[in-house]
Amino acid sequence: MLKLVGGGGGQDWACSVAGTSLGGEEAAFEVARPGDQGKAGGGSPGWGCAGIPDSAPGAGVLQAGAVGPARGGQGAEEVGESAGGGEERRVRHPQAPALRLLNRKPQGGSGEIKTPENDLQRGRLSRGPRTAPPAPGMGDRSGQQERSVPHSPGAPVGTSAAAVNGLLHNGFHPPPVQPPHVCSRGPVGGSDAAPQRLPLLPELQPQPLLPQHDSPAKKCRLRRRMDSGRKNRPPFPWFGMDIGGTLVKLVYFEPKDITAEEEQEEVENLKSIRKYLTSNTAYGKTGIRDVHLELKNLTMCGRKGNLHFIRFPSCAMHRFIQMGSEKNFSSLHTTLCATGGGAFKFEEDFRMIADLQLHKLDELDCLIQGLLYVDSVGFNGKPECYYFENPTNPELCQKKPYCLDNPYPMLLVNMGSGVSILAVYSKDNYKRVTGTSLGGGTFLGLCCLLTGCETFEEALEMAAKGDSTNVDKLVKDIYGGDYERFGLQGSAVASSFGNMMSKEKRDSISKEDLARATLVTITNNIGSIARMCALNENIDRVVFVGNFLRINMVSMKLLAYAMDFWSKGQLKALFLEHEGYFGAVGALLELFKMTDDK
């Protein structure tokens, strides 16, 4: 019980706390405030240690007594009734920063006595370990009423364990003056019932568990993310995307070292995605998996598997996003790494329809990182890079492997819908030199207008059967032969589509001729710009990449011929097997990097 007793005109007060906390014994605490009187009703000029003669004023102590049934009497520091009335003492708070009061288990008790004053300073009341309730009448309300009794300065000092262990050697600063609190720590009504517990403050009340509404798939995703985080790898599936203006390029890593435990824990939609992507070579009407480009037995981020290369037209992007929503892809991943202009264009659609966030990456950064990685791992035991030997002689021209172990510096020509030309001096040091809007998109668009074809494959197939000299005006059409002064051969193109000014020529050409002339026009323009950039940058290796070169042997041989002929053998045109997928590979590598950074 916490009791406040005043005296001396309200200037003096004593606060006592009595209760049971230690093995059926009664623990009592008192705090006294200095005032004008030495006791409640008057006395010496100042407060001393409670019950200690000649003690210095202000050197107050906090004492704890333990009174049990077997105890024969009480020390001089104990004032009040010895049976049923509790214990009361007066103490002044000395100036000190902390309070720690321990009981040395007198009379069989155990645990730590914690003062309510210290607990109140921290905003709560705590209690030491409790055992059996005390016998009736020991500090409860059924016994004699508690009262404050003035302490005689001349009383003898007791030497009980309570007096020794109750001595506080440091003390503490008194808390701000607050209205008196009444705290009862004993049983009510003198019964054997357990003592009442103080109600906990709201912030200490046990909080009910929040209801869980997550689906099993989301719980599994969380568990897999936690497991993957410990291994510094992202959760499956692993994708990288390059969303271009004409084509979407997608790379997918299929793990081949799945353990029995992983397969058992694998959620159904993850199995469905893996099976769908790896068991088909066509997806819908336009999606294609380039099986011949698959990289096998590859180790990525500590896992062994195969890397698959998939493409589909950008116009089918909304169908792809819808499929991701139907397969509940967001339960496996919340973020996809994507590069290319479409990563910005379709960002909102991914978020609204499929509940997926796109991590947008720079396409030129991804291009370089992906190219260097694929070249470093090789193409299933073969070199990734190659060139054409004897490009000026169609009969002797053949494909040869090229070692790109030391690639710097190189001129990188990315031939997609448009063209970008980069001068690369190291892995992280490059610049965009120039570009042109006349690229693969131009070729396909003109072919669709001129020939009625609908796909890139159709346009290339028609071009392979056509003759561009029926459409273009050549040097020999102007000079009647070579222009020897400047080394121009009569077969060189003087004017692309120059013969189409003549109605007679227009009536005699075929759609295949138009497709071939369109391909030669675009290719010659790119080759001319690349050669000038290589000369300006003083670089002798020109690497051509991009989906404009996919299954496009005509353009590759034309570029090889142009580089070799116009540079008199000083420039070498280089090509790569995975022409247009390097941006998507770079996006996949960024997925691993994001996990490492975390």
Swiss-Prot record:
Gene3D superfamilies: 3.30.420.40, 3.30.420.510. Its main location: cytoplasm. The modification Phosphoserine is found at residue 215. Residues 32-161 are annotated as: Disordered. Residues 38-49 have a biased composition (Gly residues). SUPFAM superfamilies: Actin-like ATPase domain. Pfam families: Fumble. It is an enzyme of class 2 (transferase). Its EC number is 2.7.1.33. It catalyses: (R)-pantothenate + ATP = (R)-4'-phosphopantothenate + ADP + H(+). Regulated by feedback inhibition by CoA and its thioesters. A motif (Nucleolar localization signal) lies at residues 218-235. One of its GO terms (biological process) is coenzyme A biosynthetic process. One of its GO terms (cellular component) is cytoplasm. GO terms for molecular function: acetyl-CoA binding; ATP binding; pantothenate kinase activity; protein homodimerization activity. The active site is at 363 (proton acceptor). Pathway: Cofactor biosynthesis; coenzyme A biosynthesis; CoA from (R)-pantothenate: step 1/5. InterPro entries: ATPase_NBD, Type_II_PanK. Acetyl-CoA binds at residues 417, 420, 432. It is found in: Cytoplasm. Homodimer. PANTHER family: PANTOTHENATE KINASE, PANTOTHENATE KINASE 1. This is Pantothenate kinase 1. It comes from Homo sapiens. The gene is PANK1.
